[in-house]
Design a protein with these regions (language model features):
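Long, low-complexity, acidic Ser/Pro- and Gly-enriched intrinsically disordered regions
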Residues: 1-113
């Protein structure tokens, strides 16, 4: 089996894996989003947040593990101060148990820092 060079994305008749991921998120198709994410070879924190948001709505049973993985990546990649870790954890809880729009907006702000 031939490996493709890193950073090169293959394209099918449905487009790139990234395009399929975005369409799956928009259409709220968890399985299609996960398949495309695997094909992409990993997600940015922003894309992983989109998948978490989808899971919070469509598959609550799997959301908590995904949210914990996202939080761990946020900590590992950004090395944020404790106050931002607490804010991120609270915002992730809002996605599932509170006002989703507030949680999403808070997390997007943290990602822009």
């Amino acid at each position: 089996m031939r490996r493709r060079p890193s950073g090169i994305e293959t394209m099918t008749s449905q487009g790139t894996a990234r395009g399929r991921f975005q369409r799956a998120i928009h259409r709220r198709h968890v399985q299609n989003a996960e398949v495309a994410a695997r094909e992409m070879g990993g997600l940015s924190l922003a894309d992983a947040l989109l998948l978490c948001e989808l899971l919070a709505n469509a598959d609550p049973a799997r959301y908590e593990r995904a949210a914990l993985r996202w939080l761990q990546r946020f900590i590992d990649e950004r090395l944020p101060p404790l106050t931002e870790v607490a804010l991120a954890a609270s915002a992730l809880a809002e996605l599932r148990h509170g006002k989703r729009s507030i949680g999403v907006e808070a997390l997007k702000i943290l990602l822009r820092r």
